[in-house]
Design a protein with these regions (language model features):
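Hydrophobic alpha-helical transmembrane bundles of multi-pass membrane proteins
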Residues: 1-291, 295
Length: 297
């Protein structure tokens, strides 16, 4: 029975890893659909390369910094040979270490790719490659160690089930810093400072990306085939649906008509917000996560 449960956990974790991996395509579609056609190639290349660089550097250095020991601030073992962290049976955190590593690798890549959308259409490709290497080597692994690797945040009871902080906030803060450095897109604001809408060239593609992103993270983060998978999926779905509805209503009232791009971004906001606590919130608690604040376009 124990071996059967381990096999089920392996299969489910790999399914979760592939779902999160496919989120790379979702992010690429959202970013490409919401930007101008002339920049599509650049955006697709950035999304591809942050996964490629993340896979290599997280394997060589990042995994060790994140899970290599119980130091409160940084991992100290497993550099260049992360499989050395496994026990005598090749297991790590209840899974074969290769399974656990690929699951964590796709999380690292997701954190990296968040920045691409925030700096779309105004970032040099070489600069983005340098950033992708940096977040995969030390930014994401070190902060991830604090939360999931036995670091100081986990020691004081910090709870982040699937990455609201470890993945999305880390990527979001990097995106904020990058957006501050490069500034707004040319033509985004008038001389008086009034924002000007820059419509995306392919809204159906953006919508498809949103749906691909819907369930990717949370259910797989159990890394086990457990009875609460349905509860996690339901809470995730309700939070995203409620955030979408709230955003639709707010934008409709504010702008006089529904706004598809803002509404789809509202869905993403709900998904990000529920990620940390989707395994512990009760029925209707998801309503607390449904108040994104639309800004002027």
């Amino acid at each position: 029975m124990e071996n059967t449960q381990v096999l089920l956990n392996i299969v489910w974790t790999m399914v979760g890893a592939f779902l999160v991996y496919f989120m790379q395509a979702g992010f690429a579609m959202v970013e490409t659909g919401f930007t101008r056609a002339k920049n599509s190639g650049n955006i697709l290349m950035k999304n591809m390369m942050d996964f490629v660089l993340g896979s290599i550097f997280f394997f060589i250095i990042g995994f060790a910094l994140m899970f290599g020991g119980s130091n409160a601030f940084i991992g100290t073992a497993g550099f260049f040979h992360p499989k050395s962290l496994a026990d005598a049976d090749g297991m790590f955190n209840g899974l074969p270490i290769g399974v656990f590593m690929i699951f964590q690798t796709v999380f690292c890549a997701t954190s990296a790719t968040i920045v691409s959308g925030a700096m779309a259409e105004r970032t040099k490709f070489i600069s983005y490659l340098i950033y992708s290497a940096a977040i995969s080597i030390f930014i994401y692994p070190i902060t991830g160690h604090w939360i999931w690797g036995g670091g100081w945040l986990s020691q004081i009871g910090f709870h982040d089930f699937a990455g609201s902080t470890a993945v999305h906030m880390v990527g979001g803060l990097c995106a904020l810093a990058g957006a501050k450095m490069v500034g707004p897109r040319i033509g985004k604001y008038t001389k008086e400072g009034k924002p000007v809408a820059i419509p995306g060239h392919n809204l159906p593609l953006g919508a498809l990306g949103v749906f691909i992103l819907w369930f990717g993270f949370n259910c797989g983060s159990t890394t086990a085939a457990t009875y609460n998978l349905g509860d996690i999926a339901m809470t995730t779905n309700l939070a995203a649906a409620a955030a979408t509805l709230v955003t639709l209503i707010v934008t409709w009232v504010r702008y006089g008509k529904p706004d598809i791009s803002m509404t789809m971004n509202g869905a993403l906001a709900g998904l990000v917000a529920i990620t940390a606590s989707c395994d512990v919130v009760n029925d209707y608690d998801f309503l607390l996560y449904t108040s994104p604040s639309p800004r002027d376009r």
